[in-house]
Amino acid sequence: MKNYVAKLRENEEKGFSLVELIIVMAIMAILVGIVASQVLPYMDKSRQSKDQQQLSSVCTNLVSAVAQSGKDLPDVSGADVKTLDGSQTPLAGNTDWTTVGANFKDLNGGAITSDGLNGKLGSKNGKGQAVLFDYDSATGEIKVYVTGHGSDDADSSKYIVVSK
């Protein structure tokens, strides 16, 4: 009897069987799926928060640029940030806004293009969208927002920053 048990122990295979490995891999795949479904929404919320901070920075720089110009500026609605250089409508030919554009360019580190700002927007709602602004001369209020959410006005934008 002792010889029989000794022979069984000698012939005993070491390691895991293929079935055991497949079961472990299936369990791991299920766990990864559960974790990913819980983490992905938080990642997009983080990107949205970062986009909001980028727009807030643009709004702050625009408010500073308007204040530095010291000019009475006309109202603007739905102007792309890249129009601050005065080359495109609705700001074309308006030297007061061109001064603001030069100030904004200095404050923004030279990035005056909407494309340059879009590279900083990382959420799915912000990527590839134009960065627009409105200016109300009566109140001095500036709204900076992202297009592409049904229409190109501030009220329909998912991302909007209003100067106080």
Q: What are the roles of these predicted feature ranges?
A:
Residues 123-164:
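Short, surface-exposed interaction loops/tails
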Residues 60-82:
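Alpha-helix exit/C-cap motif
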Residues 13-39:
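N-terminal single-pass transmembrane signal-anchor helix
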Residues 7, 21, 42-45:
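Amphipathic alpha-helical segments that mediate coupling or scaffolding at interfaces
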Residues 80-126, 154:
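Surface-exposed intrinsically disordered loops and tails
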Residues 38-59:
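Aliphatic-rich helix starts adjacent to a transmembrane/signal segment
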Residues 1-16:
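N-terminal leader/signal peptides at the extreme start of proteins
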